[in-house]
Amino acid sequence: MVRILRKIKSAAVNPLKSSQPLGAAFAFLGVEGAMPLFHGSQGCTSFALVLFVRHFKEAIPLQTTAMDEVATILGGADHLEEAILNLKTRTKPKLIGVCTTALVETRGEDCASDIANVKLKHVEELAGTEVVLANTPDFDGAIEEGWAKAVAAMIEGITRSGERTRQPKKIAILPGCNLTVADVEHLRDMVESFGLKPVILPDVSGSLDGTVPDRWVTTTYGGTSVEEIRELGTAAQCIVIGEHMRHPAKTLHGLTGVPYAVFQSLTGLKAVDRFVSLLSAVSGAAVPDRVRRHRAQLEDALLDGHFHFGGKKIAIAAEPDQLYQLATFFTGMGCDIAAAVTTTDMSKILQKVPAEWVQIGDLGDLEALAAGADLLVTHSHGRQASRRLEIPLMRVGFPIFDRLGSQHKLTILYRGTRDLIFDVANIFQANQHAPTPEALDPFRKREMPDELRSSPLTRH
């Protein structure tokens, strides 16, 4: 059984985690015509906005209620109402996703009642715009919890409840926040290859894929439509990727009765085989030849790459589901997990991480535990530890701001697992130190007796 080591420091040294409000805003960004709204001070929003822009290299729609000292004391209901009405007038969003911050949560504001009053008071002004609330205090949880709460809030607030007529080819997919833009796009292609029609919530592949719109857009310009969220109850099956998305799936099941299947990871041959089998069973179709070819390519990559992985020591710092995804990938390739650090102990998936223990902590803990490892695996803030320890760094997760194209890398299904094998094997090869001639032949520099040095044989 994995031991979960609690955080004992009173401060964070080179923080690992991102906050719940950021995770909720991230999920809202996967909806078409959405505008995430932080209910808090301007600084909270500015910090999250900087992280998003540095990671995606895109213009990110994100607004704030701009709570000041007076609102903090007297209450922020007026600021929230003013912000919602201003956003409706100026940007005309289809969805306003309100994310609470530590400021209003600590004060104990009843944001749900405040939003209900705003909706009741301004029925005509807010026509055509959904307003959804995600309670996401910064002091609790991390990006995974914020993402999951936002998705659950959208389902609760928008999806029509009750048993609906099922569309046999329609599949609802709830991806975790650890999937990249390329992962979500590849996931859709895989599902569509079986003749199924996926509805992905949230769909960041449509809104954060780097597409430049032909006109200025004040909200998100792609992603899942509000109408698709409203009709999720007509799906024949819900597929969940990541343990943190189990709660939104339960919410959908409770509202509409849609059955769900949870895949805690889609990286690795066995996990993907199970996923493909489910798609084949739901669709009633045989596995397409293209998918079979991708599987054969992965098998070849496993043969080519396993020489470079065996016995390597890996130190990973990531969110719980991504930690599980990567740790199972590396151990499946013959590596040992030398250090496993994560952000929060709220996820049950930590009990399945293939390591002796998991430390709840930060990148300072990773640096202290990673001595002797062959590879560090974390986001861009791990680069200082990599430099000091002289251990190569594989960048994963959020944020990645010192490399381009991180969102266009595949990490799931057959092709993503294949690409991971090649990427990691190439890192190992680029950083291995070739033995010197002296190391291979210890007698090369041996001392010679004086009589042999002066011998005619040595001169010729």
From Swiss-Prot:
The keyword Metal-binding applies. Residues 436-460 are annotated as: Disordered. Residues 441-453 have a biased composition (Basic and acidic residues). InterPro entries: ChlB/BchB/BchZ, Nase/OxRdtase_comp1, Nase_comp1_CS, Nase_Mo-Fe_CF. The keyword Metal-binding applies. One of its GO terms (molecular function) is nitrogenase activity. [7Fe-Mo-9S-C-homocitryl] cluster binds at residue 44. One of its GO terms (biological process) is protein-containing complex assembly. Pathway: Cofactor biosynthesis; Fe-Mo cofactor biosynthesis. Keywords: Metal-binding, Nitrogen fixation. PANTHER family: LIGHT-INDEPENDENT PROTOCHLOROPHYLLIDE REDUCTASE SUBUNIT B. Belongs to the NifD/NifK/NifE/NifN family. This protein may play a role in the biosynthesis of the prosthetic group of nitrogenase (FeMo cofactor). This is Nitrogenase iron-molybdenum cofactor biosynthesis protein NifN. It comes from Mesorhizobium japonicum (strain LMG 29417 / CECT 9101 / MAFF 303099). The lineage of its organism: Bacteria, Pseudomonadati, Pseudomonadota, Alphaproteobacteria, Hyphomicrobiales. The gene is nifN.
